[in-house]
Regions:
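Oxidoreductase cofactor-interface core, primarily capturing Rossmann-like NAD(P)-dependent enzymes
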Residues: 2-31, 35-45, 56-58, 95, ...
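Amphipathic terminal alpha-helices
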Residues: 286-330
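Hydrophobic residues in well-ordered beta-strands that form the structural core
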Residues: 101-102, 145
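Terminal hydrophobic/aromatic helix or amphipathic segment near a protein terminus
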Residues: 215-279
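NAD(P)H-binding glycine-rich loop region in Rossmannoid oxidoreductase-like domains
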Residues: 34, 39-95, 102, 108-114
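Short, amphipathic alpha-helical "lid/cap" segments that border enzyme active or binding sites
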Residues: 62, 176-184, 298-309
Length: 330
């Protein structure tokens, strides 16, 4: 089955932009439509169509999806929750869309470390995966999804590194352009990825990519030395679980919402760096990685770091705020 007409939901975000950039390399092979809310300030490249939609309206969504072969969901915010996401999917089915590319783009969502995160914070990714699996089994619409590790993380303006735990926990870092390349190849060749998720781990050897090796590679690339502070990630983990229980007691409004925010900052860190349980995402990833399936070549850590520095600049501050968590905050 060949896909020609591709609708990108959330085309102006990091992932949407990376996918569009990759698809545009094929010239006229793909007809791309970027779909946004009417309030969006998105300015599309000259070669793609821009269409606005009401994400709360089934008829508006269905009309936008008419004649589209694939819908690639890259939206963020409230529309990632279960009911809004299901509405988008149902509209795609009604419009005759062949492939739905799910809005995952995280780590392995079947891991318990991810599934325990409150849906109010991370969206309905797990339940949406199950819903799409059902549609695939019934032959109503094919689906796929793409996941990797964090796109990039180091705070370089002041040459300071925060190391969580020992710093030796394997990281499954996926450069953003690699996500774009993989998604593009998935749309170029549907059959191998129909009705299945794809997990990337493109840096080799993956078992040696850690905070410490990343730091040493950065220091070598920049010909400098970082100051280092160590963070007790086990304390963050313990406190985050306590706060999560408080959130469950308080609900999603008022104090409960504040408690959830604290817990999520801690659990987000622990999902990457905590070493104190049996959830071992390194082993999980080794079993499910599908780099070759989607045309992703293995790259050396040194090359990945150099490419990231060229792309973001030597003084970038990339997602640092996500990981800047102290146990006392919880």
């Amino acid at each position: 089955m060949e896909l020609k007409n591709i609708a990108i939901l959330g085309p102006g975000g990091n992932v949407g932009t990376a996918i569009i950039t990759e698809l545009l390399k094929d010239g006229p092979r793909f007809t791309i439509t970027g779909i946004t809310r009417s309030t969006s300030t998105y300015k599309p490249p000259p070669t793609i169509t821009h269409r606005t939609v009401d994400y709360t309206s089934f008829s508006s969504l269905q009309a936008a999806f008419q004649n589209q072969d694939a819908v690639v969901n890259c939206i963020t915010g409230g529309a990632t929750h279960y009911e809004p996401s299901k509405l988008i999917i149902d509209a795609a089915v009604a419009a005759g869309v062949k492939l739905f590319f799910a809005d995952e783009f995280v780590g392995e969502i079947t891991r318990e470390a991810f599934r325990r995160l409150p849906e109010a914070f991370v969206g309905g990714k797990c339940r949406i995966r199950e819903y799409l699996e059902g549609l695939g089994r019934e032959g109503k619409m094919a689906w796929t999804s793409l996941n990797g590790g964090p796109f990039f993380d180091m705070y370089m303006p002041n040459r300071h590194a925060r190391i969580y735990g020992s710093g030796n926990q394997p990281l499954h870092w996926t450069p953003l352009p690699t996500m774009g390349l993989a998604a593009g190849n998935m749309l170029r060749n549907l059959d191998p990825i129909r009705n299945r998720p794809v997990l990337l781990d493109p840096i080799t050897p993956s078992s040696t990519v850690t905070q410490n090796t990343l730091l040493r590679t950065l220091e070598k690339a920049l010909d400098t030395t970082f100051t280092v502070s160590h963070v007790d990630v086990s304390k963050i983990h313990r406190n985050a679980l306590v706060v999560l229980e408080k959130w469950k007691e308080c609900g999603e409004q008022g104090e409960g919402k504040a408690q959830m925010g604290k817990a999520m900052r801690g659990l987000g860190v622990c999902n990457q760096f905590y070493e104190g349980d049996d959830e071992g995402h390194a082993e999980d990833s080794e079993r499910t990685v599908q780099n070759e399936l989607v045309g992703v070549e293995i790259m050396q850590l040194e090359d990945a770091v150099r490419d990231a520095l060229e792309r973001y600049g030597e003084n970038c501050q990339v997602v640092q705020g996500m990981y800047n968590v102290e146990a006392c905050e919880l």
